[in-house]
């Protein structure tokens, strides 16, 4: 488990390129037949990937000491979106088939969660966010047909994109975790511009669907102290509540956003005009 401490905005603005990457970038999300796990002190979110290839993968009691529990989801809820080939997730013996871009919410208290791929040639890639939970909500599968996609932006401003809200109150109940998937239309490069902050929630972006020769310049920092982190395919970045979170790519891309914090009101954000950015 990679533990990332919280960082003050006054400290963050003094960091160089490598310092910013060390604090906020999750460089390696998927490793064959393993799970990755980054624990952030910011709202206690856990971020990672699970890619079963030749065997099943599960998170066992080995994380208990670091989390202060006897099993992974004893006090946590889990959100998973599959960006790879078809797979399965077994939750306390109940098996769910999770295809490409299907998702699964797992409620607090699930003791055994086992991940598998159906075809080793095209393994599943389960990206997950995990957050502290105060009560148990039912485990539920969510498919792309259930997420009521919303298209925003314009080709003229190069930010035409479709937002798919997987884990939001209109779709299912969670304690605090919200997740979704945003896909840019071909030829469009910007996400979340004009940008915003939200003091009551932190957020993590996971960028994928990118060619090897492409990248995204992820914008972060306070609106008057902006910085950037160069992102490549299948990498994640942690965004504190004081930071903007936007990006521009060399080509179109897709990203998964996940939020935890004080509320789940999607529009509870503080907008920043482009003219006010520095």
Curated annotation (Swiss-Prot):
Its cofactor is Zn(2+). It holds the Pfam family KduI. The keyword Iron-sulfur does not apply. Keywords: Isomerase, Metal-binding, Zinc. It catalyses: 5-dehydro-4-deoxy-D-glucuronate = 3-deoxy-D-glycero-2,5-hexodiulosonate. GO terms for molecular function: 4-deoxy-L-threo-5-hexosulose-uronate ketol-isomerase activity; zinc ion binding. Zn(2+) binds at residues 196, 198, 203, 245. GO terms for biological process: D-galacturonate catabolic process; D-glucuronate catabolic process; pectin catabolic process. Coiled coil: none annotated. Catalyzes the isomerization of 5-dehydro-4-deoxy-D-glucuronate to 3-deoxy-D-glycero-2,5-hexodiulosonate. Belongs to the KduI family. This is 4-deoxy-L-threo-5-hexosulose-uronate ketol-isomerase.
């Amino acid at each position: 488990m990679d533990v990332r401490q919280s960082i003050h905005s006054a400290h963050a603005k003094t960091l160089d390129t490598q310092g910013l990457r060390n604090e906020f970038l999750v460089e390696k999300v998927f490793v064959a037949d393993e799970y990755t796990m980054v624990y952030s002190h910011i709202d206690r979110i856990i971020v990672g990937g699970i890619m079963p290839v030749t065997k099943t993968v599960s998170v066992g009691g080995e994380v208990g000491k670091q989390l202060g529990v006897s099993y992974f989801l004893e006090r946590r809820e889990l959100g998973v979106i599959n960006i790879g080939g078809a797979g399965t997730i077994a939750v306390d013996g109940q098996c769910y088939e999770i295809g490409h871009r299907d998702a699964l919410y797992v409620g607090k208290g699930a003791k055994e969660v086992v991940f598998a791929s159906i075809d080793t040639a095209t393994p599943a890639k389960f990206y997950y966010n995990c957050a502290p939970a105060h009560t148990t909500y039912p485990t539920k599968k969510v498919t792309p047909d259930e997420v009521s996609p919303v298209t925003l932006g314009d080709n003229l401003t190069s930010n035409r994109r479709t937002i798919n809200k997987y884990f939001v109150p209109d779709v299912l109940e969670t304690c605090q975790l919200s997740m979704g998937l945003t896909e840019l239309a071909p030829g469009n490069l910007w996400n979340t511009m004009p940008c915003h902050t939200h003091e009551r929630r932190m957020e993590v972006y996971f960028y994928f669907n990118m060619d090897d020769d492409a990248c995204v310049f992820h914008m972060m920092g306070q609106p008057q102290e902006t910085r950037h982190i160069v992102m490549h395919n299948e990498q994640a970045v942690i965004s504190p509540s004081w930071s903007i979170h936007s990006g521009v790519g060399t080509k179109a891309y897709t990203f998964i956003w996940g939020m935890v914090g004080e509320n789940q009101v999607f529009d509870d954000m503080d907008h920043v005009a482009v003219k006010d950015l520095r």
